[in-house]
Amino acid sequence: MMAAEATAALIDRLPKVRGELVADAPLAPLTWFRAGGNAEVLFRPADADDLAAFLAGTPADVPVTIIGVGSNLLVREGGVPGVVIRLGRGFMNIEIEGTCVRAGTAALDVAVSRAAQEAGLAGLEFYRGIPGSIGGALRMNGGAYGRETKDVLVEAVAIDRAGKRHVLTNADMHYTYRHCGAPDDLIFVEALFQGTPGNAEDILRRMNEITSSREATQPIRTRTGGSTFKNPEGHKSWQLIDAAGCRGLRKGGAQVSELHCNFLINTGDATASDIEDLGEEVRARVKETSGVTLEWEIRRIGIRKERGGA
């Protein structure tokens, strides 16, 4: 746990908020892995104005980390120093604007795809296959089933570390595969997506196909962090992992999924270290057998606690 005195001193240095500040807040319940350490301070802003004021008033030396719904996130046992920001209800808005969909970045990807479908807007069906929030999709150029965020984004609204708002166009995001080139200190709060008029029943049919495909090929009903590694150019990570003999491989309470071996699973009592160590073992075996270095897609944050450490 974080040192109580240091945490109290940190909170004293933070500005007053309308949202919620929680000291030594457990983050494991906020991640799909259900493993990991605590945030020194967790901030849940009431809305974008609350977030902007908080960032403007927070000393520059205080580390700030933003998280979403935790679907593609691993929090190390040593915890996350400084302030962890998690956007909530004030950032879940979804509105239809002509042939566009405007969404807050805490809105779930599946909710955005559903809103577009109900409005008869095609093009956002792929979000049905991404188990995360819009903020994560913006930051990682989230994609599935042949489409990516870069294919549908019109603009994104963000707040920088000084509390200033910015509107970024698609080009400003400098998207590449599973990567956004926008400054790391920007916190996205809203996005506008372009749809195309379509038949609502046809759109729903495609979304249901995506759901069926996910259920048949991915361990979606387990404690998992989604796709573990990015696909290297010219390769599929799961094929490299399978060829390296890693399907079903275990370390502590962590396991490589038997169903889809680019997914790591918490079988019930895995620590964050179990999960990360298993991922590194997979990377080493793939490197040895194929010469390819896998790059993590799961975001890992916090301080690593060495085994046997206090």
Curated annotation (Swiss-Prot):
Database matches in Pfam families: FAD_binding_4, MurB_C
Group of enzyme by EC: oxidoreductase
Active site: R178, S227, E297
GO terms for cellular component: cytosol
Pathway: Cell wall biogenesis; peptidoglycan biosynthesis
UniProt keyword annotation of NADP present: yes
Keywords assigned: Cell cycle, Cell division, Cell shape, Cell wall biogenesis/degradation, Cytoplasm, FAD, Flavoprotein, NADP, Oxidoreductase, Peptidoglycan synthesis
EC number: 1.3.1.98
Span of domain FAD-binding PCMH-type: 34-213
GO biological process: cell division; cell wall organization; peptidoglycan biosynthetic process; regulation of cell shape
Molecular function per GO: FAD binding; UDP-N-acetylmuramate dehydrogenase activity
Gene3D superfamilies according to UniProt: 3.30.465.10, UDP-N-acetylenolpyruvoylglucosamine reductase, C-terminal domain, Uridine Diphospho-n-acetylenolpyruvylglucosamine Reductase, domain 2
Names of required cofactors: FAD
Entry's family note: Belongs to the MurB family.
Annotated function: Cell wall formation.
HAMAP family in alphabetical order: MurB
Descriptive protein name: UDP-N-acetylenolpyruvoylglucosamine reductase
Species the sequence originates in: Parvibaculum lavamentivorans (strain DS-1 / DSM 13023 / NCIMB 13966)
